[in-house]
């Protein structure tokens, strides 16, 4: 029997499940599992870790040939569920491409968002969303990410300048503005043209315009990143065998930057710092994933209590907080209610503190990923004990959750919270 290389997920169905980490990677297994328990996840598919081994054994061309029919069928499945078409001008489907090994590890390929855009599709997207700035901003981000990650233009050391960042600075300076979001549509068009010229100058090739050419480039870049220097070094340190390989997850894009009813954020089912059983997180209205962690805009708190605590620490009055930095609980109560229900569902399902990423596209909530959250030593102990007392785990599991090397943190002095 022909081995199965591509597993689809979407609309509450999935060919994979949580215990298939070895084959689908951590991310792919979780995306499948979330679908199966009724969490809204944008549809997509995962290419297995076995294919990564085939990639190194048989070579790139052979693997693309082996995958072609399965990937095209999986894309057609996403098109049906999202009611849009890959590479289509009038009603475009865009996708994200992510790497996902069984253990999360640095050095692996960064995520690529907005794949499927070109000069024609961006105009179609502009008309469809009635938001040209959003369409061109998505395109600008895509060319930059693809150039950095797939075409190898990202600087390898801190001293080198990222060619794309240099162009952004140059355009901002010429315009006399400080922030990226102060650039208008015409500026973004200029950026795209300059970005593509930089790609041609550095790689000798034009930026790929075909959606499938872009997709194959990104898929192969994930497999290539498995053998990059940082990844190899990390595996040596952690004792991870090279033959594990990485999976590739391709997923329909959902957009948090389609206006005031869209948002993006990250949240935790408990406090990762002190272990308090308090749902918390940050979000930004009209923004895309990276913006929350990039520090370009001040993210707002998800819960009202979190927002009030944050304002108190930052010396912001309650009037100012409500006017300028309202919590999601206050600004988007319906979405907040759904988010709160789903984070509880996920924590109960995985029986551990969850770190989740989500996007709201025009009033519809989508979960992008969930994983067991990283936590401090103190939080680790408190969460394990609380979960035990709440009947979610037994004593044996609680003990197994205590990492001995983290206990060392508890022996060091810490700042007094009340100080």
Regions from the PLM with identified roles:
Residues 1-419:
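Nucleotide/phosphate-binding sheet-loop regions of phosphoryl- and nucleotidyl-transfer enzymes
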């Amino acid at each position: 029997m022909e081995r199965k290389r591509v597993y689809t997920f979407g609309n509450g169905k999935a060919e994979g499940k949580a215990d298939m980490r070895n084959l689908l990677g951590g991310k792919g297994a979780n995306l499948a599992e979330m679908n199966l328990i009724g969490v809204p996840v944008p549809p997509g598919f995962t290419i297995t870790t076995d294919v990564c081994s085939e990639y190194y054994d048989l070579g790139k061309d052979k693997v693309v040939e082996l995958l072609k029919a399965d990937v095209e069928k999986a894309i057609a499945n996403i098109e049906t569920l999202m009611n849009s078409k890959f590479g289509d001008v009038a009603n475009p489907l865009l996708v994200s491409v992510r790497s996902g090994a069984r253990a999360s590890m640095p050095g692996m390929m960064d995520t690529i968002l907005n794949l499927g855009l070109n000069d024609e599709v961006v105009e179609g997207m502009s008309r469809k969303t009635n938001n040209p700035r959003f369409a061109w901003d998505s395109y600008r981000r895509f060319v930059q990410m693809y150039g950095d990650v797939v075409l190898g233009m990202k600087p390898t050391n801190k001293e080198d300048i990222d060619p794309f960042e240099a162009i952004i600075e140059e355009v901002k300076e010429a315009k006399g503005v400080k922030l990226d979001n102060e650039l208008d549509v015409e500026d973004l068009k200029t950026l795209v043209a300059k970005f593509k010229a930089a790609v041609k100058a550095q790689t000798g090739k034009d930026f790929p315009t075909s959606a499938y050419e872009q997709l194959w480039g990104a898929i192969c870049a994930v497999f290539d990143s498995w053998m990059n220097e940082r990844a190899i070094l990390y595996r040596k340190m952690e004792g991870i065998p090279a033959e594990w390989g990485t999976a590739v997850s391709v997923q329909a894009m959902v957009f948090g930057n389609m206006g005031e009813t869209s948002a993006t954020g990250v949240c935790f089912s408990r406090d990762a710092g002190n272990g308090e059983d308090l749902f918390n997180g940050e979000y930004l209205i009209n923004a895309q994933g990276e913006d929350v962690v990039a520090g370009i805009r001040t993210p707002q708190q998800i819960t009202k209590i979190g927002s009030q605590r944050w304002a108190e620490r930052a010396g912001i009055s309650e009037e100012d907080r409500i006017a300028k930095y309202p919590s999601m609980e206050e600004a988007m109560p319906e979405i907040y209610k759904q988010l709160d229900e789903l984070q509880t569902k996920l924590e109960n399902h995985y029986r551990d503190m969850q770190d989740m990423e989500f996007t709201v596209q025009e009033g519809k909530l989508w979960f992008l990923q969930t994983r067991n959250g990283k936590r401090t030593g103190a939080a680790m102990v408190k969460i394990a004990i609380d979960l035990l007392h709440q009947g979610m785990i037994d004593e044996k599991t609680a003990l197994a959750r205590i990492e001995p090397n983290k206990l060392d943190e508890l022996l060091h002095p810490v700042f007094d919270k009340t100080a």
